[in-house]
Amino acid sequence: MKGKVYLVGAGPGDYKLLTLKGLECIKKADVIVYDRLANKNYLKEAKENCEFIYVGKASSNHTLPQDDINRVIADKAKEGKIVTRLKGGDPYVFGRGGEEGELLKEEGIEFEVVPGITSAIGGLCYAGIPITHRDYASSFHVITGHLRDDDKENPEINWNALANTNGTLVFLMGVANLQKISSNLIKEGKSKDTPVALISWATRSNQRVITSTLENVYETAVRENVKPPTLIAVGDVVELRDKLNFFESKPLFGKNVIVTRSRTQSSSLVSKISDLGGNPIEVPTIKIEKIENNIALE
């Protein structure tokens, strides 16, 4: 039996932002290879004997190099298994899904790609920031925040073009290089007063949004101790946040709620807590069993 690989975008974090097809791929997987930003609650949807392999990457702390991740995925598929590669966001938006797909093609392994909601769009939405708006931005640009460690210019990033566009700029994985990003944009002509939003843990109950200006954003981030994962949104659309911020106004936003019901009974309550902006934590303390041979109850 030949194996198959599904490269699945897990969305930006909110449990309910996974696609139906993505959920199907999780449920039928023999092996799930998942990263740091994929919501771990999705693993509860897997079948009982599913194998879980964590390959998460944090800043300067990678569980496995990308080549080794590619090898794990391919080898498991060659064993005849259905492999679901679960990635935060979308596999093809700085998710290195293209590299994984190339290897699978080269080795004759069947694969499919299941798109996911990228945090560049979904994350801004949950922060009350539309990535485009008729009166503010008619385009958007998603840019990697990983810059070179030396002082040389990144040949793949045209700072002059970015600084002189009226579109929204979204930098992913850029907190460590925030000072370089802001200074490069200002150097190439972007107004120092351009609004900027820093969105940490976007779409989750612990989402945190800090706004500033291009000139002051680095100092603001240092003062507020902003850490990855954080999106950097640059543009006038940030000004709409106060009007369009629906998520953080939910009654349970920012609260952890422990659910002690048995797992078979907790799903509806967990869903309601999530809908109200809370973070449900399932800690079953109740187990329902059939009563047998209890004379006291006869």
Where on the chain are the PLM-derived regions?
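N-terminal basic/disordered segments at the start of proteins
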Residues: 24, 31-39, 258-272
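Class I SAM-dependent methyltransferase SAM-binding "motif I" and its flanking Rossmann-like core
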Residues: 14, 88-165, 210
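A cross-family signal for N-terminal binding/gating loops and helix N-caps
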Residues: 259-298
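Short hydrophobic/aromatic-enriched beta-strand-loop microsegments
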Residues: 50-57, 108-112, 131-138, 189-198, ...
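A contiguous loop/helix-start segment that scaffolds small-molecule binding in enzyme catalytic cores
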Residues: 2-7, 78-83, 139, 144-263, ...
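Class I S-adenosyl-L-methionine
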Residues: 1-15, 20-117, 121-122, 223, ...
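Short gly/pro/ser/thr-enriched loop/turn and capping motifs at secondary-structure boundaries
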Residues: 40-41, 59-61, 118-122, 139-142, ...
